[in-house]
Amino acid sequence: MASSSASDCDAHPVERESMRKVSQDGVRQDMSKSGPRLPGESAITDKEVIYICPFSGPVKGRLYITNYRLYLRSLETDLAPILDVPLGVISRIEKMGGVTSRGENSYGLDITCKDLRNLRFALKQEGHSRRDIFDVLTRHAFPLAYNLPLFAFVNEEKFKVDGWAIYNPVEEYRRQGLPDRHWRISFVNQRYELCDTYPALLVVPYRASDDDLRRVATFRSRNRIPVLSWIHPENRAAIMRCSQPLVGVGGKRSRDDERYLDIIRETNKQTSKLTIYDARPGVNAVANKATGGGYEGEDAYPHAELSFLDIHNIHVMRESLRRVRDIVYPHVEEAHWLSSLESTHWLEHIKLLLTGAIRVADKVASGLSSVLVHCSDGWDRTAQLTTLAMLMLDGFYRSIEGFEILVQKEWISFGHKFSSRIGHGDKNHADADRSPIFLQFIDCVWQMTKQFPTAFEFNECFLVAILDHLYSCRFGTFLLNCEAARERQRLAERTVSVWSLINSNKDEFTNPFYARESNRVIYPVTSVRHLELWVNYYIRWNPRIRQQPHPMEQRYNELLALRDDYIKKLEELQLATPTKLTDSSTPPSGSAQIAPRMQTHF
């Protein structure tokens, strides 16, 4: 039977604990029959349906719909819920069959999900049952079309940690030793007037004035000027990011832009060249001249060394993921698996991203040059490359807190268009702006965790939880397209951060084998032979193919559970005999010896 939690990496246990506490406080009664309920979540309707499970066949159940999720319970067994799907995960809802349909279970709804699932429900033809469910699901899965709020804006969850406080740009730049004599913090974009998709605070060369920045902005796509992302703690080589120059077919030049890149180059006295990595294939960069874009030519930028990284655009990546979906859900064809996987080109794209990031990281680590990274607009491939390179170079970003800061900084504050790429609350499933750019980044991170199992503080469940809530609309973290829009909507005041959930339950997301090595640089092997399809994400809904947890990790978790059980028993013993434990001049040998042992790390 298909389950709501197809792998051990699922946030639902945390969610259930949250709801149990709410019930104990008297705020919300236990909804075990009609489904779980978060604070702020309200029931809308329920209907008897037949779920066409692709793995075990038809299941008769009752479908509950709230303003956050759809939830299915079997009417035939009293087992755990069969489905628990946030409405934000839904990409498309279609009616199947018509009034003349006569086949068994041929009349109902077909639901396509962003997490690679397809859900099919058969309904009775009489009584407008399908129309009612279709209308309710459409309104609440795609609330923006009906002037309804996303669930994040009505979510009333409370956590002991405020995830919005995790990232402070001044503190993060200070951690990197900035500002210094070569770099300064500029507030030229404080009102988002220079660039409406950049953060309010930017790090730029000390010798460049704010007026210089304004002139440079006119020659960069979307005004996304070159700014610093990361600086090496020893050799002070920097990773910069920006968008393409507006060269056009006429070969337009900007003396201000050329001088600005020279100033960047001169911040690192160890080299006479500035390395520019253009993420695009060279032919695409040339083609972009026709629409006013382009690249840094040798004539205009003689002190720059330009390389193209051959990473394809959002449309190619969207098609590649569609092919992955076709081969992993609902069934995997074993006989042609390798050729089918190769035909998706998904691992080839992962390889190119990792290879490009290694080139960026190695150039900076060697101190040979500072690096400028861009694609077309500087918010998709650019973010992938800078974050992966920074993960390779800086061990801080491989911690749980550091990774959260990395995502907040390079993806969220620098304007990756999450709303457009994911389509939060939008029913236009065929929108050409949708693309799995952030999913690819997380996949690359997972590949690195497989090759360096002790280098990352977080585990696979951490990455899966991030992706699940990328779509769920339960939290405000990934909503909207840029920092300016989030400030206007007061997201940090009106919504909960996903980091609140994670940082309040760190044990569930911690890698037991983590060994902190802050100065270690890691370069993954990028040959396709060493890359894998992430089974526990892409094929997690198939109960027949799910990977088993690592035996050592499983044993570690068992020991942790055993430790917690002993601590609980010790606390119960202390509560049961308070007088004896307090009055005795010599503590019982058992309790005196057990307590310290409970702090031993297994």
Swiss-Prot record:
Protein name: Myotubularin
Gene encoding the protein: Mtm1
SUPFAM superfamilies to which the protein is assigned, alphabetical: (Phosphotyrosine protein) phosphatases II, PH domain-like
EC number from the UniProt entry: 3.1.3.95
PANTHER family named among the record's database cross-references: MYOTUBULARIN, MYOTUBULARIN-RELATED
Major location category of this protein: cytoplasm
Family: Belongs to the protein-tyrosine phosphatase family. Non-receptor class myotubularin subfamily.
Region (Disordered): 1-40, 578-602
Transmembrane segments: none
Enzyme class name: hydrolase
Pfam families: GRAM, Myotub-related
UniProt keywords, alphabetically: Cell membrane, Cell projection, Cytoplasm, Endosome, Hydrolase, Lipid metabolism, Membrane, Phosphoprotein, Protein phosphatase, Protein transport, Transport
